[in-house]
Regions:
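Core catalytic region of metal-dependent phosphoesterases/phosphodiesterases
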Residues: 1-81
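Short, solvent-exposed polar/charged micro-motifs at secondary-structure junctions
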Residues: 63-65, 92-96
Length: 201
């Protein structure tokens, strides 16, 4: 849901919920593509390679594909960047003993677990650590189910009118997690929105 809205209608494609949007969709999409591009450039200053996964959400499933295409075109001649295609809503990658899934999280965890263990049985069986990242509800949650550790991450975004009226709200932060190829998660950093604002001033 990086763009929050899929197109200029400003509604969720599935349910038609109204979304608060600021400005024209093209303007927002262009800015979003530039932010993602700059984030990848910054990562390249610190890492040998960057793998980009932009999971499709329920607010912007088509716009997310456009972001993927824009990044793919921009980094076409950069061998250190891989932009993973988001044809499937569940994205995954394997790295040593770590199998990692990225899914927006509209479906409940039991449904996700059933799908993952059925479709990715071989990858999960080869891995000592299985992580599933979700974001849909924005409330920090962490739960082990079967072989998988599910984690729901906070977002930086403010609640829009629909979610505020429904009394939804969560802490606003961004996190980074470091995974060891053999030992799984080894460290994490959390940055609250207030820190980001203070540093920006």
């Amino acid at each position: 849901d990086f763009l929050h809205a899929n197109d200029r209608k400003g509604q969720t494609p599935g349910s038609g919920n109204s979304l608060d949007v600021d400005g024209r969709h093209g303007k927002v999409a262009r800015r979003a593509a530039h932010i993602l591009r700059d984030a990848v450039r910054l990562m390249l200053t610190k890492h040998q390679s960057v793998q980009v996964i932009n999971a499709r959400g329920n607010h912007d499933p088509d716009a997310a594909v456009s972001m993927e295409i824009a990044l793919e075109a921009y980094f076409e001649k950069e061998p250190r960047v891989t932009v993973q295609r988001n044809d499937c809503k569940i994205q995954h990658f394997q790295w040593g003993n770590v199998c990692h899934f990225v899914y927006h999280g509209e479906k409940n965890r039991a449904h996700q677990l059933a799908h993952l263990t059925n479709r990715y049985r071989e990858q999960i069986g080869q891995s000592q650590f299985v992580y599933v990242d979700n974001g849909h509800v924005h409330h920090k949650q962490r739960e082990e189910l079967g072989p998988c550790l599910f984690e729901v991450w906070n977002a930086l975004t403010a609640s829009d009118q629909y979610h505020a009226d429904a009394l939804y709200g969560a802490s606003r932060s961004i996190s980074s997690v470091v995974y060891h190829k053999q030992f799984g998660e080894v460290s994490r950093n959390v940055c609250d929105l207030r820190i980001i604002r203070q540093e920006a001033d």
